[in-house]
Amino acid sequence: MSLVPNTICLFDVDGTLTKPRNVITPEMKDFLAGLRTKVELGVVGGSDINKIKEQLGENCINEFHYLFAENGLLSFKDGSLLATQDIKKFLGEENIKKFINFVLHYIADLDIPIKRGTFVEFRNGMINISPIGRNCSQQEREEFEKYDLEHKIRPTMVSILKEKFQSLGLQYSIGGQISFDVFPIGWDKTYCLRHLPEDKYKTIYFFGDKTFVGGNDYEIANDPRITKSFTVTSPTDTKNFLSELFYKQ
């Protein structure tokens, strides 16, 4: 079967292909395997490659035509490494140290119901910050998300960091349930689009759940290269949109 020409579907991970921080279901895996025979598929996640593998499976780089970890700062095409970028070179160690020191002091003084561990996670192309700590349980994760919606813990912290470190040229993106990402301006999910040749891909569909202003899907969902973006609420929602696009008679 020939693929739909000049077309690719790009997917967020959390809330789009999987439930937040859950693994992909066998049903969704089978659905995507069938879809892959019809149209090219790509994944763009904010997490590092190991976390994406935890959710989508160890072999995921071979199951999509493109896989973009850390917004595309680590990129794979047809299972092979395509390109990498490094935030350490961009910011320099002194700026990174000042930024992380401030973040840790801020979280230490933050009064929230519970704290766990791994408040700062340094990745290849970004810094991930979690006020509650990334090694909280799934139940604690869900409780923090509700608390954050009411008390604006993450948005408040982001606004303070923006003001304090405005000279560094950083961008902040709230994604998932418990954390937010920090990266140089332009290193959001739109970064991955530079790896998709414009003369080949005339139609790009994007599927994501955090397409609101400040969400980590917002920039790519509104990029002029995206033909149409679909705001989804669950993997089932994603599957329904795809069925309408590619299986409707």
UniProtKB/Swiss-Prot annotation:
Residues annotated as the enzyme's active site: 12, 14
Pathway: Nucleotide-sugar biosynthesis; GDP-alpha-D-mannose biosynthesis; alpha-D-mannose 1-phosphate from D-fructose 6-phosphate: step 2/2
Keywords attached to this entry: Cytoplasm, Isomerase, Magnesium, Metal-binding
Any single biological process term in GO: GDP-mannose biosynthetic process
EC code(s) of this entry: 5.4.2.8
Keyword presence, Metal-binding: yes
GO cellular component terms given for this protein: cytosol
Superkingdom of the organism of origin: Eukaryota
Subunit structure: Homodimer.
Known function: Involved in the synthesis of the GDP-mannose and dolichol-phosphate-mannose required for a number of critical mannosyl transfer reactions.
Entry's family note: Belongs to the eukaryotic PMM family.
Record-given protein name: Phosphomannomutase 1
